[in-house]
Amino acid sequence: RAFSAHGLPADRFCHFARRLDFQGFLSLNLASDALLDTLEWSGGKTTLEALGCGLPVVTCPGRFMRGRHAFAMLRMMGLTRTVAADKDAYVRIAVELAHEPGLLAEMRSQVTACRNRLYRDTRFMEHLEDFYAAQVHAHVQAPNAKRRP
């Protein structure tokens, strides 16, 4: 009924899949128009794989970290067009993508163009290397200092 209320045939826009192996999951992503992120418990690896397949992701960030993963990924990519402020906006964005093939194509193109901002970001690695170097340096400077396990 929710799909019908927005003029969308549910059998075209909603698919509940059985458990899939990884290849089947990627194939489903490649055959999909967009990923609707789950509310309150955002997708992590699911979102990463969807973005890797060029799928636009519609999300509504929650109050807690568990509901903000997709938002953080999209923000890192510079793509906040599909980030909803509330549940009503989440539905509006999803319906807009379903009714406007041109917008959907534009969003897919933007995801594909920007995904390396997410996948090739080396800042975390650089910060981790700096942390390790600082810890080694601190240990060399004070080798007998008591440390917490």
Can you describe what each PLM-predicted range is?
Residues 20, 42, 85-88, 123:
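Short beta->alpha linker loops
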Residues 11-18, 92-149:
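C-terminal amphipathic helix plus adjacent low-complexity
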Residues 31, 49, 69-73, 93, ...:
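Generic recognition of well-ordered alpha-helical segments
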Residues 22, 27-69:
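A donor-sugar binding/catalytic signature common to diverse glycosyltransferases
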Residues 4-11:
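Short helix-capping segments at alpha-helix termini
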